[in-house]
Amino acid sequence: MAAIKTWVFSFLVLEVTTVLGRQTMLAQSVRRVQPVKRTPKTLAKPADSQESPGEWTTWFNIDHPGGQGDYERLDAIRFYYGERVCARPLRLEARTTDWMPAGSTGQVVHGSPREGFWCLNREQRPGQNCSNYTVRFLCPPGSLRGDAEHIWSSWSPWSKCSAACGHTGVQTRTRTCLAQTVSLCSEATEEGQLCMSQACTACDLTCPMGQVNADCDACMCQDFMLHGAISLPGGGPAPGAAVYLLAKAPKMLTRTDSSGRFRVPGLCPDGKTILKITKTKFAPIMITMPKTSLKSATINAEFVRAETPYIVMNPEMKARRAGQSVSLCCKATGKPSPDKYFWYHNNTLLDPSLYKHESKLVLRNLQQDQAGEYFCKAQSDAGAVKSKVTQLTVIAHDETPCNPTPESYLIRLPHDCFQNASNSFYYDVGRCPIKTCAGQQDNGIRCRDAVENCCGISRTEEREIQCSGYTLPTKVAVECSCQRCAETRSIVRGRVTATDNGEPMRFGHVYMGNNRVSMTGYKGTFTLHIPQDTERLVLTFVDRLQKFVNTTKVLPFNKKGSAVFHEIKMLRQKEPITLEAMETNIIPLGEVIGEDPVAELEIPSKSFYRQNGEPFTGKVKASVTFLDPRNISTATAAQSDLNFINDEGDTFPLRTYGMFSVDFRDEATSESLNAGKVKVHLDSTQVKMPEHVPAMKLWSLNPDTGLWEEEGDFKFESQRRNKREERTFLVGNMEIRERRLFNLDVPESRRCFIKVRTYRSERFLPSEQIQGVVVSVINLEPRTGFSSNPRAWGRFDSVITGPNGACLPAFCDDQSPDAYSVYVLASLSGEELEAVESSPKFNPNAIGVPQPYLNKLKYRRTDHEDPRVKKTAFQISMAKPRPNSAEESNGPIYAFENLRACEEAPPSAAHFRFYQIEGDRYDYNTVPFNEDDPMSWTEDYLAWWPKPMEFRACYIKVKIVGPLEVNVRSRNMGGTHRQTVGKLYGIRDVKSTRDRDQPNVSSACLEFKCSGMLYDQDRVDRTLVKVIPQGSCHRASVNSMLHEYLVNHLPLAVNNDTSEYTMLAPLDPLGHNYGIYTVTDQDPRTAKEIALGRCFDGTSDGSSRIMKSNVGVALTFNCAERQVGRQSAFQYLQSTPARSPATGTVQGRVPAMRQQRASRGGLRRRGSMAPLRFSGVAQQPLSN
């Protein structure tokens, strides 16, 4: 007996020790709920407290009116705040966050004390959404606990016993500490106790129909027969599919035969039994047994292609103070849908049992050690995918969220404003780096913060800059703080043209998924406003006339706002050929004349079938278009971004050996046909890198995600072409059903990043970097024996430049520097930027890369050997930096794992450069604003653009009669607003463009500050505009319609000086009949580009790159030739060296100003004016 007691005691000690050990472990991982801050008693009492006995809760706001509406439901409030709400509230009160009662808003709302409050966007007036509401509840007296009782939540129910039936186990319960002070939370958050599970019993399964089977997990009906027919997405049969019965454990019942049919006896048609049907590469089918009294039943089902999970919502960057709460959200789709989410903090997996595999990660009572990088991994039976990495910043209670000291930011001054103090034409006005900061947040825990806070300028000082003969006012940033981010909108514009001759795709459709979102115009142009929640922009361009192959593109865009321009190149669809469905057909895949095909398609006889699965025996009209990577001019037509997702959820690149698009149709009815058992024969001699041969795979494109998915492997097979020649082919099998674009690709893991920056001029100043430039890289394969001459291209990528340049992914090799080489190009709004020259001058300081690493990279601009070739690209060898080499550790090539170092590299680090050809114009704003970055907008009465989401550009056309081109200036000042009258908004300079046909006539399209509301939207200001030609000029005439308008819209500006023209700018968008051109857009560059094109054309709806001097003119000046020795504004600027006060920056040579428009006969420079030819490649031009 004593021995038994000793054993029982030891067992209890062991079990209690286990419980305490689990308690300690779990207590360390439990997150505390954010404490609810006390509400002052004056706010806690309602106005009608004498008429409403009871006590009011605090105000709750757990939702915002995004999505379907605003939901302040009682059950959700209880979930977050527990016992802060009583069990049975008596009343409910709702107000907007602006403190307006819900009944006074005029909106349709719903509410009850037992259910809470809600407002639906679809029930409101058109164009109006619900306001953001906050609610509180009136509770019976004494039903709300005091603050002292809010240290701990109530215990949760006991968990189930951990032991199997008939055994002893442990069950636990938990509670949460609600206190703001950690010292009050010293007690246990989890406790456990021993438990005895239920005694094991006989089978307790009851069957409403049939009998229980021997395993006691299903009901069986011996006289019932289930028939099934399973088909593939294209209508064909699905042989070999497994049929499972879902019981306590899935049981395989049978497989489908060659015709996709199956029979299963003994199941019960009870309307409850569930079958699961699976087949490799397809999403499982779940079927509930039909309920019937018959002896048999037939089910039909069609597989849906399995799709790897795809991230549609990435966690957002957020900032919080210690003690606050935050939620990070991740969402993925797929077939089947992902059922598990894993969260990682600084690459360490967070405890899945704590966060329940949920897509929303909630962290309460944050501590500073929880700051860092977070990402999620979504998982399903079809695979896994990882989200983008986001940054969570956690600062101390007393820490400043932003650095109050602005960083240096140089602006360029006018030509007559040289500063002796800095010995340059630049002035430091300062700026605040725009980054997410920990600002004021409400109590709601949301995926997207209700208010996004950024560091921005909070205080400026007005300073005066001394220039030659006048003073120039400016506003300098002196303090930064955390404030609401400027509202922005992301826009993608572009032009869709053919790869071969530049023919536009007219009136084609643009799809995002299954939704048509835009349409191309007559010139192939399109504009798309990107939805706010878009993570990856995948667009499919469909030609209604079927001239071009449908093309899917993944287009980079700026999530922080502004417009990005893309040139979309499409392959012309091959002329169809006629095939006999009852014969074996061979179709070659190759487009290079004089070269063997890369591969062949072999379509055996009787392989074609209709969409319903019926075999097709007639004539087939077949169009197979092959994108041949041996022709470098086709690189820009590559579809998607050539990426796939591996089994671990990581995105990996592919190196292509050719893409082909297929279109099979019934010659008689044009009905689309499918083809099964198609073979692809890849000529192994076309694969120049031996290590790629065993890794070759066949892929198809998912048009919804823009990702490539594996179709199958290749195997070796020898074939004899003729009596003497025998070749080795890689043979792969495929079926052509719902997907029509295929790829011969190799996964490639040898990756690096190239650092590229783009500048406004050859001065290469950090403050003159351009954002929103599309930088593209073409990966090349070397020709055997000639490392400098490319054999074929293998991959095409594009990246958008940000405030710190861009990092382009490219293949690289650390053993052989010549294994890979690349071409790099850059364009802005369709205009190609120039690369730094490599011949006849080779200046490492100008290129941006020091020696000896630059020699190893073999930098060559495209005109290196032929000066007639365009200067808009450069080629380098992708030599991976050696880890122990100091000269290779600071860029411009970074190892793939060093992406963060590439993105955060300072301007002094090595990088490659592109620059704009300096045009003959100059802009100065009193309140500095970077047009590439709409988030740099500052609230100020003197802001040139008064509204951050509505940029209005105004131009006036000025005609100059005289032998020389003249610099024309607009000086823009406040005219009628009491806050700005007499104060300078800014100045604009532009040089007139000579007319092609009239030697003594030139014209200028001059920007001026539009009249209208200022930033406070209180009252309008008629801008006082002075148009001043810089020379010996006098006003000859004023457009009569413009003059009449100004006379009829007083006040009228005084014009006593005939050498200039003064007006109070019109409020109305007048048009070409007045010589005024006005365009409003959500992107400033787009507005200016469109308005400038109309001004050049002299119309209100057209566009031109050639100046038409005699149409749409507002002002005419007669200008005499300048005296000998007197310099123009731009000549003065050319003759003065541009020196920067910035230190630590690699400076290039200072070029002479290029007068592009004058030298090209009035042309506005665009990217398509001259062909770009690559060294050693005798193919068609890359840019058409």
UniProtKB/Swiss-Prot annotation:
Localization annotation: Secreted, Extracellular space, Extracellular matrix
Signal peptide: 1-21
Disulfide bonds: C161-C195, C165-C200, C177-C185, C330-C376
Keyword GTP-binding: no
Tissue expression from the record: Expressed in articular and meniscal cartilage (at protein level). Primarily localizes to the superficial and intermediate zones of articular cartilage (at protein level).
Glycosylation site positions: N129, N132, N346, N420, N550, N631, N1000, N1056
Domain TSP type-1: 150-201
Post-translational modification: Cleaved into 2 chains possibly by a furin-like protease upon or preceding secretion.
Keyword Nucleotide-binding tagged: no
GO CC list: extracellular region
Function: Probably plays a role in cartilage scaffolding. May act by antagonizing TGF-beta1 (TGFB1) and IGF1 functions. Has the ability to suppress IGF1-induced proliferation and sulfated proteoglycan synthesis, and inhibits ligand-induced IGF1R autophosphorylation. May inhibit TGFB1-mediated induction of cartilage matrix genes via its interaction with TGFB1. Overexpression may lead to impair chondrocyte growth and matrix repair and indirectly promote inorganic pyrophosphate (PPi) supersaturation in aging and osteoarthritis cartilage.
Protein name as annotated: Cartilage intermediate layer protein 1
Species assigned in the record: Mus musculus
